[in-house]
Amino acid sequence: MKRKVMPSITTEKAERQFIQFRVSLWNNEHEIKLNFPQEWKLIECRMAGHDFPSLSDLQIHEAFEKPIGTPRIRDIARGKKKVVILFDDLARPTPAYKIIPFVLRELGEAGIEPDRIKLVCAYGCHRPLVRQEMIKKLGKEIVENYLVFNHNVYEHHVKLGTTSRGTPVLINREVAGCDLKIGVGCIIPHFTTGYGGGAKIMVPGAAAMETIAYNHIEIEKAYPEHVGLGKVKNNPRRVDLEEAAKIAGLDLVVNVVVNHRKEILGLFVGDFVEQHRKGVAFANKVYGTENRGKFDLMVLNAFPIEESPEKALWPAEESLKRGGDVVLIWQTTDGILPHYLVGTFGSDYGGRKWQRPGTLRIPNAKNLFIYAEDFSKLEKRWWGPEDRVFLYRNWEKLIDTLWPVHGKGTRVAVYPYATLQCPIFPDGY
């Protein structure tokens, strides 16, 4: 009889050990069940908030009734002529289709008609969305009844000023022309600004390449020790983009903290700094994942940020024994996200922050094994040297390859949604 796999507990005396993995965000999202040798000492490392309850519609409504640091949306909106709602793209798990109807209801209470409301996909340096993707993100009713635009990182901007650190603030022309600017996004771990969310929906979301590049490259270069995963307090990149968002006139942000099923665990409405910090404090309690020591082998699921799968590798840097191996579960049909700042666009060149491929993306690992249905030669090169990156479509063959090296007693960590997880950070980090 199969035994249930409990979180962070070694499973013994089972014919096979099974763990469920969620895969393919936004594209036929589903769960797959993978098996592991019973002889392995398997530990599933779940985030602290794995079983936190999701918010009801009433609780979501209450968050809109009591914003943080600002009046209600309906009160801010009274007398405004043009409204823009910024939303993030499919590289983020924000259930905008769930949140934006509450925003529209507030605007309706202020007497704002639909033809005075526009929505802009604030994807920064990512790619635009096609209609079906907009429907996935926003819902069919919104796409059919409101004007929805993609941002353009290279054209149609208005220069509104310069931050004290020298970042030129060039903002999407459609956004700049509105007298009420509302952002909708999510607060999830981020490798340079500490956490996503807050002002990031405006910068980089709706900013020009000149703005984004300066904030990403020059600010980061000047203060490298102050940026990083989970670092929000006094983070120069975040402080700079918050100043830029203020110059751009961002009025209010709605941020969610979600679980691995895109269910809303926390919702924070209001001033893009104040609500963000409260959201980060809650996100730390949700996404923080206990360090269970050192491991011979680590299995990391790239879900839900599968288009940026390198974000799943942080547990290996923290807990993999030197010379150990990493298995990446990467079940997405879209592959690596096209990114105009860091992406590859030729045989030996790319965006302004592009790095030449070469060393393995996990310095302390011996090999990287990727479980993927589809992949390209370019993606394989992106991960590192060909003799250290191995791609498998068949899970059983992958396990058979690992077994001669990782036999009985191998200590194995499994992170079921690694791109959503992060270390446990102290308060005010």
Task: Give the label of every model feature segment.
Residues 2-64:
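N-terminal amphipathic/basic leader segments beginning at the initiator methionine
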Residues 9-11, 108, 314-429:
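C-terminal non-catalytic interaction/assembly regions of soluble proteins
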Residues 92-112, 312-320, 326:
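Histidine-anchored nucleotide/phosphate-binding helix
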